[in-house]
């Protein structure tokens, strides 16, 4: 799988295919998927992490089931913009996944995505236990929605129609 910038993905992405969002944690992988028009991100069940081979197989099954054309993977950049061990682990995961699939990936700054997701779940009056179960996929949705919004902006710029919704 190639690692692309969001601009490169916008040029290569075929129309009417879904994009998946991933929030890689140490215990789970939060998942979300776009609609075919790539306007909305919807959370999906998490993958409980076991070891890389099993995690990769589950992720590829998800991608096939959802007909995913690309992955947007949250990159856990520190608040000051520096990259720590979690960024290195995410990059290593993406590189290793690249040996197993041709589906391209974009690394997307995920700063505050989990905080935003938790606030939304609290506002929705989701219990603490259910929040713990849903937070990673909700964060994956925030990550993916940011990328979808950027893809839409790039598409409007490419078409010259800056006033389109």
UniProtKB/Swiss-Prot annotation:
The protein's GO terms of the molecular function aspect are: nuclease activity
Q: Which GO terms describe its cellular component?
A: cytosol
List localization entries.
Answer: Cytoplasm
Would the keyword Hydrolase turn up in this protein's UniProt record? yes
Q: Which coarse location class applies to the principal site listed for this UniProt protein?
A: cytoplasm
One Pfam short name: RuvX
- The EC designation for this entry is 3.1.-.-
Mind listing the UniProt keywords for this protein, alphabetically? Cytoplasm, Hydrolase, Nuclease, Ribosome biogenesis
Q: Which InterPro entries has this protein been placed in? A: RNaseH-like_sf, YqgF, YqgF/RNaseH-like_dom, YqgF/RNaseH-like_dom_sf
Keyword Membrane (UniProt)? no
The Gene Ontology biological process terms listed for this entry are:
rRNA 5'-end processing
Q: Which Gene3D superfamilies match?
A: YqgF/RNase H-like domain
Which PANTHER family would you find in this protein's record? Answer: POLYNUCLEOTIDYL TRANSFERASE, RIBONUCLEASE H-LIKE SUPERFAMILY PROTEIN (PTHR33317:SF4)
Note the NCBIfam families from the entry.
RNAse_H_YqgF (TIGR00250)
Family membership: Belongs to the YqgF nuclease family.
What the protein does comes down to: Could be a nuclease involved in processing of the 5'-end of pre-16S rRNA.
How is this protein named in the record? Putative pre-16S rRNA nuclease
Q: Which organism is it from?
A: Sinorhizobium medicae (strain WSM419)
């Amino acid at each position: 799988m190639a690692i692309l910038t969001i601009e490169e993905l916008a040029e290569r992405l075929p129309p009417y295919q879904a994009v998946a969002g991933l929030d890689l944690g140490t215990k789970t992988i939060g998942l979300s998927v776009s609609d075919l028009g790539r306007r909305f991100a919807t959370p999906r069940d998490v993958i409980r992490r076991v070891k890389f081979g099993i995690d990769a197989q589950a992720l590829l099954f998800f991608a096939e089931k959802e007909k995913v054309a690309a992955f947007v993977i949250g990159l856990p950049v520190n608040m000051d913009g520096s990259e720590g061990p979690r960024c290195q682990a995410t990059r290593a995961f993406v590189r290793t996944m690249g040996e197993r699939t041709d589906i391209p990936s974009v690394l997307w700054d995920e700063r505050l995505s989990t905080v935003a997701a938790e606030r939304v779940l609290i506002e929705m009056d989701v219990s603490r236990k259910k929040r713990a179960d849903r937070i990673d996929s909700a964060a994956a949705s925030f990550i993916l929605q940011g990328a979808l919004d950027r893809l839409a902006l790039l598409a409007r710029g490419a078409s010259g129609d800056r006033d389109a919704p």
